[in-house]
């Protein structure tokens, strides 16, 4: 599977990135403006937070979907029957934020969003005219006045050996949004599925960022950019006794953006959240 590693500063970066996203749904970028030290700081601070009782004061708001989601309410991937082995905190600029950590995650969210919007501009500029003609507006313009972009601080706890049969850290799924920005986690495990159904490890070199297309981009472009299936597998050996932390930023358009005829970003998001809740009820 030819997931390209793209130098963010290279003259041909926009074309190379868009080509990889088109053919695989994924790309890996290096030499980008996101400080490695900032990512490590967030991993250290939030691991301590997840290990503390402080998290219980920030339980998620059902309406706004901000705050801490414990393992008891963790997601069940669409089409799956077992909950993922994870807990996470949804960070929005307007939402709950723990007093027990610094503002590092907020600073990361702003920088990652800027990178994602730049990448979205690259995609728009290097998309064929016949695909761009499908769009209700230029891709970067979809982000104007958006309040939906989400940073998920994810913690996959150490495995204890008593996990339910078939449970994995993150079952095979696709993302809902336009683009996802995912810096290398502190442990490997992320895999992506190619068109033939084979699974491939995504590079975990610290300092690299994996980018994948989501369902909204696939819908808006009529399938030109595929929303690629990915998963996080359970580790073995010593790695199984360590937490895995991850910082996906999900780039979402403004609510009123029309993705396809009769489907706005808001209605599509509501539809997908309803599907996830339905799956969760089946596994409760």
Where are each of the predicted segments found?
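Peripheral, non-catalytic segments flanking oxidoreductase cores
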Residues: 1-284
């Amino acid at each position: 599977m030819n997931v390209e590693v793209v130098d963010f500063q290279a003259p041909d970066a926009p074309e190379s990135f868009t080509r990889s996203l088109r053919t695989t749904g994924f790309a890996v970028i290096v030499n980008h403006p996101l400080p490695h030290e900032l990512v490590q700081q967030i991993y250290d601070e939030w691991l301590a937070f997840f290990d503390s009782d402080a998290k219980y004061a920030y339980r998620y708001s059902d309406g706004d979907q901000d705050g801490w989601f414990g393992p008891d309410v963790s997601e069940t991937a669409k089409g799956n029957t077992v909950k993922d082995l994870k807990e996470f905190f949804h960070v929005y600029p307007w939402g709950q934020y723990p007093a027990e950590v610094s503002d590092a995650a907020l600073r990361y969210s702003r920088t990652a969003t800027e990178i994602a919007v730049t990448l979205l501009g690259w995609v728009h500029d290097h998309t064929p005219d016949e695909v761009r003609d499908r769009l209700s507006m230029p891709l970067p313009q979809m982000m104007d006045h958006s309040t939906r972009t989400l940073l998920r601080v994810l913690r996959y706890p150490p495995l204890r050996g008593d996990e339910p049969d078939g449970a994995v850290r993150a079952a095979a799924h696709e993302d809902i949004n336009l683009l996802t920005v995912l810096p290398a986690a502190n442990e490997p495990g992320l895999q992506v599925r190619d068109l033939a159904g084979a699974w491939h490890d995504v590079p975990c070199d610290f300092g690299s960022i994996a980018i994948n297309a989501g369902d909204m981009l696939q819908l808006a472009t009529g399938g030109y950019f595929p929303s690629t299936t990915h998963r996080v597998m359970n580790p073995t050996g010593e790695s199984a006794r360590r937490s895995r932390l991850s910082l996906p930023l999900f780039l979402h358009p403004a609510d009123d953006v029309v993705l396809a005829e009769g489907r706005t970003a808001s209605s599509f998001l509501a539809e997908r959240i309803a599907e996830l809740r339905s799956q969760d009820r089946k596994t409760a």
